[in-house]
């Protein structure tokens, strides 16, 4: 009986079966490898201007929140970050701002509307003291363009942690 009602209402499945997603776990002293992908896996980040938009957005969000960005890799349909928020509760705020601001800019640039980014960002955290894991994550992020056989024009990859100490965005290092 109930299934017939849902079939007639064009809902994919009954509402009673929807399970809420688990809240994101963000811990103090952790770094996060974050991936954000374009909606429908479309290749929307191939333009050179995308790099400037990302760098400007990062500079802008750094005035609001304190974090360390160790790596950034812009692929043609997704972006990788290696980031350490100094206040764990700031990570969702940082990512919300970055995704909102870049989506707004890219939609204007590409003369399109609607969602620019696919579902919420993927994050994988590890203790900042785990240097081996950090190096493996950096290798993965910077090896991504090569593994995808991308030209240097289409991919942009950088590490901001090549100095002796990590860059704190509050110090105005960008």
Task: Identify the role of each PLM range.
Residues 1-174:
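Short catalytic/metal-binding and nucleic-acid-binding patches
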């Amino acid at each position: 009986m109930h299934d017939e009602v849902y079939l007639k209402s064009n809902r994919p499945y009954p509402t009673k079966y929807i399970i809420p997603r688990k809240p994101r776990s963000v811990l103090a002293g952790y770094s996060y490898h974050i991936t954000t992908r374009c909606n429908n896996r479309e290749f929307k980040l191939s333009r050179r201007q995308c790099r400037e938009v990302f760098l400007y957005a990062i500079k802008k969000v750094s005035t609001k929140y304190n974090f360390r960005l160790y790596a950034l890799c812009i692929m043609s349909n997704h972006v990788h970050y290696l980031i350490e928020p100094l206040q764990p509760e700031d990570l969702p705020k940082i990512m919300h701002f970055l995704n909102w601001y870049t989506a707004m800019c890219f939609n204007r640039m590409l003369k399109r509307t609607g969602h620019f980014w696919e579902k919420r960002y993927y994050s994988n955290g590890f203790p900042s003291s785990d240097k081996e894991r950090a190096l493996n994550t950096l290798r993965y992020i910077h090896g991504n363009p090569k593994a995808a056989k991308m030209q240097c024009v289409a991919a942009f990859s950088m590490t901001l942690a090549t100095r002796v100490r990590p860059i704190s965005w509050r110090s105005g290092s960008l």
